[in-house]
């Protein structure tokens, strides 16, 4: 059984014909929980609980508590358009295994791992995923009356490493790769 609750706050300023800029920002606070391991068909069994109803309600894999998306578009002289989109997330949780008591029945446990946060523009360790994309566009009118646009896109402008597939297995002997992609 799964539950998902969220609230989104959003502010937008449209760019109209007489304005030189527009943009928006949206913040989403979400909470995803599960009873039983519904996203992991093969490794989701936990011998401590006889039925799904016996399992506790826990944070679900795929849960991301905080997400911020901001965008802006700017009209510059000579009809040059600049735009940006920023996506910041607290990190998407994944299934993980705790094998510190062993790997056999009634020994290995499952838990939910949250990727580590990293600093972003001096804000501190808040966001695990960080993406800033930029675009420049110059519209042109051809001699035959058709329109053409020259576009330059820069994806992940700050070259942030947005990893997935973390090593999340806890072992009896310390795992030197724990928490690494």
PLM feature segments, named:
Residues 1, 49-56, 112-122, 177-181:
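Extracytoplasmic loops and strand-loop junctions of Gram-negative outer membrane beta-barrel proteins
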